[in-house]
């Protein structure tokens, strides 16, 4: 299957302008092929994009004497240790009588043995012995006796698996560059969401963050006045573009730098207020309390004037602020890079992986980063903050026949356009 490596950059302004305001909802029959509408949504596979590398499991979770079962893109896989100790993957179902290999044992180095009749496979899926029939079994070498093997690669302690039918693409195309950088410290964790991968990934860069995350520790410690402006924005938000046919990024990441005032630039973010008045609600204010307003002012001042100036950590435009195929969202905090990758499990569930990347210069700094991640950051960002996303996304009804978009939905809609027209294995009508 052809791999689109050099798709020309394409502006997504059309997808953004196709997202009408709430006062002017889209019209037409469900399934009409309009940018960002159900026509695009219906072209995105429910079980995921097959021709890609996906994060699958932390290497430390795979023991040496047994396999671990994991469902990915609707396929049952078994992960176990190969002959060199690295993690490998086969189809979980024994081709003999469809027993689960994950319930077997690794009796011999680099192999896994079926618990039913003792059929033993190596890391390439080749049937090497049939313990139930004995050493002279004629089953070995028979056509169809081997199990399907899935290519794997372990990077920074995380196992990635190729789920495609074609020869694997270069893993560097699908996995963030820090996984190949010896200087980078990449800490990761994962959760299982009871949601299809599409809404799990589309839960980014729209107006939900201001409301859903308003009481998260992450937002409370930020310049929330700036976040108010940033997360409410529709047409004022910077336009996006497609880079190398693989990534949807913002054209102007300087917009997201809340430290502009340190360099003498008076920004709209600096003038924003966290609390707003809603005339249609009788001039009610939200957030409701003055305490939140004052907290926003204090945190805004501290972050704009006391936080040291830092450079962006990501210099590769393809992997800058935005989303990268197949399912990796990126945000550069300048102290670290936050990434969230979604691996489809089945039609109803997804694995969500979180990456925290930093570049500590000393052993002590690396030790501190690991400790901070273990006792604080992982909870703050991936449970307290993203747990709010999880709670909302799990109750969505994604397949309803109608969606009424707002201009602030431009980024998720542009991602649909990226997948439908640029991803490997998705047919263009």
Residues of each region from the PLM?
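Rieske [2Fe-2S] iron-sulfur-binding domain
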Residues: 2-27, 32, 41, 57-186, ...
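Blade/loop signatures of beta-propeller domains
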Residues: 40-46
